[in-house]
């Protein structure tokens, strides 16, 4: 079951947000200034071209008990990092050993070796608690994908977009073992994620936004310059491409500032009055890796999806068989030689 919006309310909220003048968050004033030798394009604007990545163990939200500690130092920082590493490994082990279709082949294991970001306890900088201000609807939306992972899928539509090899990288940028490649022209910025080949094309000109009735998986973005900072406003997101519980009312404002050769300052603010009680903001530096990117061959032709769905049908058949004979499990069905029914190619056998 898909947790949908009240579309009439969502449209009203979208119109209000589009018409409103968005206040600039207080943290914008504290952004670092570009160095004198920060790279620029041949046409004079700051250059964002390169391969960029955020590699850190600092969590998006501040853990409970740290709401009044935006930064942490010394032995406390070491203990905090070890706590994050332990929780990450335990969560990954639990997911890979659970009776659900989940796994990344250990690709995210490398994240645990990353340090804290400037001794911060969260990437969220506003609200000051470092936590996302959910409404009940937003909290329900955010929990839906993880709950659906526990369910037997009826079809591919019940699985995540990246599992279906349809969409991987999207906005906003976030910490990831997979970098993003930026390409730039005088009137466009292109952000390419090799992870499931997500490519976002951002016009930098005066063209109007597309009609609000048109929704896209990665939204529709428009860029404009605020001094040496590129401001990207994105809306028209398909509500199924939710970010932290967002819906059709999502409006995203991102700010990119090239600080020096190795650093691109990135910040974004999330607006969605249906999912959040107030706007919330994140900021962090992206690092120029200067490393080559390699093809992300999604499931090498997505062979995993038919196997996953056939396994789901076998699970259903097993449950129906057990229920029909009022058995607790197949192991109770024993003819004396220790054999029990099994499932092969979706058929019951002994």
Q: Can you name each region flagged by the protein language model?
A:
Residues 13-23:
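Bacterial N-terminal signal peptides
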Residues 2-3, 26-350:
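PEST-like low-complexity, intrinsically disordered acidic/proline/serine-rich tracts
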Residues 1-10:
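N-terminal secretory signal peptides that target proteins for export/translocation
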